[in-house]
Amino acid sequence: MKLNRFGAAVGVLAAGALVLSACGNDDNVTGGGATTGQASAKVDCGGKKTLKASGSTAQANAMTRFVNVFEQACPGQTLNYTANGSGAGISEFNGNQTDFGGSDVPLSKDEAAAAQRRCGSPAWNLPVVFGPIAVTYNLNSVSSLNLDGPTLAKIFNGSITQWNNPAIQALNRDFTLPGERIHVVFRSDESGTTDNFQRYLQAASNGAWGKGAGKSFQGGVGEGARGNDGTSAAAKNTPGSITYNEWSFAQAQHLTMANIVTSAGGDPVAITIDSVGQTIAGATISGVGNDLVLDTDSFYRPKRPGSYPIVLATYEIVCSKYPDSQVGTAVKAFLQSTIGAGQSGLGDNGYIPIPDEFKSRLSTAVNAIA
């Protein structure tokens, strides 16, 4: 596998799309099954030799591992992934430009109808990658910062413009915040990360947000940057800035992350595998059958103290039955390896491994892809 970057590299990424690619062409291959690492997960190799997918930048770093595991499980097969945002991932999948799409939000009603026309069968939303959204900031004098939903909403809609605003200071009584102007950085591209973050602001701000949600940033203030890589780089290089990033990008850029005060009470919550795992454990499925859309409202206003509330699930948007069975076979094999051996080590790279109880439900759906 070869990792290509467009634009100048900063840390893990810089501006532009991340492309995961490997040698080979689009010839079809046949093959038997391979047994890979975690829980001796069965991978039914075969079908299209080189898959193509695009979408969510939040899962870009996880895809690096998933492609490596797929190549090991199914020699001669690979996947090219372009991290160009959830909106592009859905659009390119529905336009039959890719074999599946990655999105941090499930298909809308209209998008699902377009996907069914493209597939000739219902499309499924399969949540495969879980990751917290970090609120990151650049204040040299502040190494630990507490924020809550109402205060974040007022920062990101421009109601609070100074770091020493009384609302922020009240959450951080142990030190005096600087009288520095806040510089908001947001995603300029259509983004599932933005949609999830705005859904959190809407749910957790007690009405302070007032801007709605959606893949485009609605706050009306700040500076836009493309992709998780772009917002990470902008925050790192802008004193007084604040933004939202998928956790793995915040880690890679060594950004300082805020602790979040939640509706469950207790101490402000930092991102850890345990704090996010508690949140995922409370999720329910609102989709029907093998369409595993999650009801994430419980994420944003947790009832259990110690649960980190800003969590996104990245869905792989797939055809339940592909017009070309060779594609369906390969997509199924890729996802089998992803939810099997691909889960090992994710926690070291800013992602949360799929809980065992949910993995069995996901495996049933993946194995049904044709």
From Swiss-Prot:
Residues reported to bind phosphate: 56-58, 86, 104, 191-193
**Effect caused by changing residue 116 to A:** In strain: Erdman
Gene disruption phenotype: Grows normally in liquid culture, traffics into host (human and mouse) acidified compartments early after phagocytosis, suggesting it no longer arrests phagosome maturation as well as wild-type, impaired growth in mouse macrophages. No growth phenotype in phosphate-rich medium (3.6 mM Pi), nor in restricted medium (Sauton), but in phosphate-free Sauton medium dies faster than wild-type when pre-exposed to complete starvation.
Induction remark = Transcription induced 6-fold by phosphate starvation, protein levels increase after 24 hours starvation (at protein level). Part of the pstS3-pstC2-pstA1 operon.
- Lipid bilayer topology: Lipid-anchor
User: Cellular location of this protein?
Assistant: Cell membrane
Which residues are covalently lipidated (S-diacylglycerol cysteine)?
23
One annotated GO molecular function is: phosphate ion binding
Q: Is Kinase a UniProt keyword of this protein?
A: no
Extract one GO BP annotation from the record. biological process involved in interaction with host
Q: Which Gene3D superfamilies match?
A: Periplasmic binding protein-like II
| Transmembrane helix in keyword set | no
Q: Lipid link (N-palmitoyl cysteine) located at?
A: 23
Q: Which residues form the signal peptide?
A: 1-22
Keyword field? Cell membrane, Lipoprotein, Membrane, Palmitate, Phosphate transport, Signal, Stress response, Transport
Q: Which Pfam families match?
A: PBP_like_2
Q: Which GO terms describe its cellular component?
A: ATP-binding cassette (ABC) transporter complex; extracellular region; peptidoglycan-based cell wall; plasma membrane
- Subunit-level organization: Monomer. The complex is composed of two ATP-binding proteins (PstB), two transmembrane proteins (PstC and PstA) and a solute-binding protein (PstS).
NCBIfam families in the record, alphabetically?
A: 3a0107s03 (TIGR00975)
Q: What does this protein do?
A: Functions in inorganic phosphate uptake, is probably the main carrier for phosphate uptake, it is the most highly expressed of the 3 PstS proteins under phosphate starvation. Binds phosphate; probably able to bind both H(2)PO(4)(-) and HPO(4)(2-). Part of the ABC transporter complex PstSACB involved in phosphate import. Probably plays a role in host phagosome maturation arrest.
Q: What is this protein called?
A: Phosphate-binding protein PstS 3
As recorded in Swiss-Prot or TrEMBL, the protein's gene is named pstS3
